[in-house]
Amino acid sequence: MFEVGEKYPVESSSSSNDIESRGVQPITSLKDNKSIGMIEKDNDDLSCEQYSTCDEVKRDLKARHVSMIAIGGTIGTGLFISTGSLLHTTGPVMSLISFLFVTTLAYSVTQSLGEMTTYIPVSGSFAQFITRWVSKSCGAANGWLYWFSWAITFALELSVVGQVIQYWTDAVPLAGWISIFFVLLTTFNLFPVKYYGEVEFWIASTKVIAIVGWLIYAFCMVCGAGKTGPVGFRYWRNGYAWGDGMIVSNNGKYAISFINGLINAVFTFQGTELVAVTAGEASPRAIRSAIKKVMFRILVFYVLCMLFIGLLVPYNDPKLTQDGGFTRNSPFLIAMENSGTKVLPHIFNAVIVTTIISAGNSNVYSGSRILYGLAQAGVAPKFFLKTNKGGVPYFAVLFTAAFGALGYLACSEDGNKAFTWLLNIIATAGLIAWGFISVSHVRFMNVLRKRGLSRDILPYKAFFMPYSAYYAIIIIFIVVLIQGFTVFWDFNASDFFTAYISVILFVVLWIGFHFFFYGFGKDSFKWENILIPLDDCDIDSGVRDINDAEFDVPEPKNVWERFWLLIA
């Protein structure tokens, strides 16, 4: 069996603590293929000028932090707000089908990440996996697009939080709320990551408790505890099961509704891959623990919520679209109001506000770490590597947060249209990232096979591999290709760019970086520069022996601790 430091010597276990104290693991520069992420133990005479990453992030996140960051980044606007748009457009049945379908994709992608990230835990890791095992230009393009999606998501969260607060009062203008949270979240992300992790843990814990409580409440209402009596599947009968869709014919309506539902659901699920982004600041075992619980969290926090929303709120409920549209009317609140509960909607709206703030916090954190990883790889300006005393890449934080200014688009008369525009860009960019995560994993497994190495060497072995990776690649390619095809029936330039701008941006970045690396000569079109040969794929740099990582898993002493061990 392959042992780290023997057949492919990269890092001996004896030096793991030295390396861990410095931050992220070594990465290969895209431009010169030199290690730029680590100062070797035997090279103490090397100066910081020779290694531009002397400023490094710190590995201060614990297992519960990592798991809750993944939850905190995903439970936000997508679940609490955009599910209303999904329900109205597609109906309860197609909404649930869309969620179940995207669940299979999210599970496949996170399992692929689990195998790669626990083996090579580096900050912003999956963009670097694409760089190592697909192509340098593809990795750079994907990394920038993925960063862009999180920067835009921050703008979307800012655009929504003020509108949710306006559920209570319009005394403060929307621009005022956007400005307040813009400054607060940007400032908070400049504090050391251990504070971020601890605050995010407790905020995300509030989300978890609130959702579990809402599910219990919803179950009681469906069974007849509310003023409407037993609801059951009332809104799944008599034409309520399917939304209006976009066209009249039934077959076409179902197909279009399903595609629209997928895009909306992908936006809701985006962030399940955040465990990989935190890899540079967490124990590898913490990553492994978080990956194992992805399916449980998805089923509880997404699928069950969508099921009960569809049971309690009819797709044509006027509250879904009145008074500002979907962004001000969460289906969670509508379900409570329809059941006759007076005070609980206000309490839960406070939870939603906290949730969106937390999600925005995670957006800036994730985007800044992705940008930091891009700078390490040599495809972003070097000043993004600068960190403060707390190990925070402050230039990366500020640049990522600056895109929050797009949140002011919500102040225009077409605020809801801007929300939909941002949502589609984010969802498509997220799908592209998911697709290349799966492509990277297929290449990773091929390299292992080429070297004669068994998957038994991996700290985490996923189920249904490699079949689920191929499944994700095929489905994602099809969805990205057809998700905007209705614009061609009655072509509109604005709708076209809304649907495909992420695809266009990715292609432009890919081509641009390809010529940046290889120029315009004959070498540019050599196959080995388009797709890295398996023999040249680097699966050695950054490898860690997971058994050497310090990680304590305390035994749960009571029911409460068992609950948190299950969740986080």
UniProtKB/Swiss-Prot annotation:
It is a multi-pass membrane protein. It is found in: Cell membrane. The keyword Transport applies. It comes from the Eukaryota. Disulfide bonds: none annotated. GO terms for molecular function: amino acid transmembrane transporter activity. Glycans are attached at residues 33, 492. InterPro entries: AA-permease/SLC12A_dom, Amino_acid_permease_CS, APC_YAT. The chain crosses the membrane at residues 66-86, 89-109, 145-165, 171-191, 201-221, 255-275, 294-314, 340-360, 390-410, 419-439, 469-489, 501-521. The keyword Protein biosynthesis does not apply. It holds the Pfam family AA_permease. Induction: Expression is negatively regulated by the transcriptional repressors NRG1 and TUP1. Expression is also regulated by SSN6. Expression is repressed by HAP43. Expression is induced by antifungal agents caspofungin and flucytosine. Finally, expression is also induced during biofilm development. GO terms for biological process: amino acid transmembrane transport. This is Probable lysine/arginine permease CAN2.
